[in-house]
Amino acid sequence: MSGELVVGLLDSGVEAALATHLKASRAFVDQGAPHSLGHGSAIVRIMLHHAPRTPLLHAQVFGERQRTTPELVAAGLDWLRDEGARIVNMSFGLRHDRAVLRQAIAAAHGAGMILVASAPARGAMVYPGGYAGVIRVSGDARCGPDEISALGGAPADYGACPRDADGRLGGASFAATHVAGLLARHLRETDCEPRALLDRLARFHGRERRLA
């Protein structure tokens, strides 16, 4: 893909004060408080920390509750593809592999989109992180906001700071966004293959060792 580097976000709603940073936004959920979860707003803040000049597309696939469906995610991803997103951040994981989501991921990957998703540090595989071509990211307490670790695929491909931009919230979902943000920052200046770029940027290699 060529042209302007645009980042797509699949998440919950975004508060009005941050909506001005969005190139376009579309809701794929029914009525409800558009940003009551706060998660989508936290994701936007992380992206602005890493790549403040990068255009952002926002597909709201979560409503008032922390729930979505493979059909909603697939519809949002298809829209982001049609709107020209090059990098897509998916800071969530669904328990089950579903054909509709698998096919949407395959179409996006085939179109040259860079797909980043969160993955748990322990436990069963989740989706879309479990699909081929998706960069899987888990939280790594060793990493600051601008640092990543190369984990070699188990439990994830990369680790990153598990905190939001304010340091108040934590989880693998924010780690994925830090990686997507670093990709957006650096791919504005280079045509390097995404995984090769992340390997080069990695400060740590191998899994985080936690003492009992």
What is each of the regions a protein language model found here?
Residues Q31-L94, R203-R209:
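Subtilisin-like peptidase catalytic core
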Residues L5-G13, A124-R188:
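Extracellular S/T/G-rich loop segment that most often corresponds to the catalytic His/Ser-adjacent loop
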Residues M1-S2, L48, T68-N89, R98-M113, ...:
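Mature extracellular/periplasmic domains of secretome proteins
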Residues M1-H50, T54, S138, R209:
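Active-site core segment of subtilase-fold serine proteases
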Residues R86-I87, R188-A212:
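C-terminal subdomain of the subtilisin-like protease fold in secreted/lumenal serine endopeptidases
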Residues V14-E15, F92-R95, A121:
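Short glycine-rich anion-binding loops that position phosphate/pyrophosphate groups of nucleotides
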Residues L57, I114-V116:
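Structural detector of well-ordered beta-strand residues that form the stable sheet scaffold
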Residues A17, Q66, D97:
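Conserved protein kinase catalytic core
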